[in-house]
Amino acid sequence: MTSIVIIFIVAITLVWGVQIYNKLVHDRNTSLAAWSDIDVQLKRRHDLIPKLIDAVKQYASYESSLLESVTSLRSQAKAIEKISERENVERELQTQVHKLIAVAEDYPELKANQNFLELQKDISNVENDIQYARRYYNGAVRNINTRIDSFPDLVIARFLNYKYHEYFQLDD
């Protein structure tokens, strides 16, 4: 009788551990997939930047320091893997791209250029997509981090050495 009780307790504990493990794996994979979505949107923005620079160069040759800054930040952002470091570079890149678009106010020909207007619209759409992807990612990170912190999941998470995931913050 006692051996049946022990087997039952071990079986219940094992099933419980497997369920928690599967939930942790699911949440981790959701977080990784959500980061991939952000990365795709950031790459879309990076792909638009050279076109924007070319459009601005044609009309605003006096803005060379801003153009160089945007080009440099784009290269840096593409090379960084760590989320917190990339977040800082992407935030600065976002600011510089907005400054570059604002330059159009000083150049009426640029402001009226159809190609520039289309790029401006595309960048705005990508910025919106980045924000949507960022919100989804941060929600997924919140879920996995909450699971890592919550009992009884934290027992399995700590045993398996699960680490907190980093949030990704950009200016809205």
Map each language-model feature to its residues.
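A helix-centric hydrophobic-segment signal that preferentially recognizes long
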Residues: 1-172
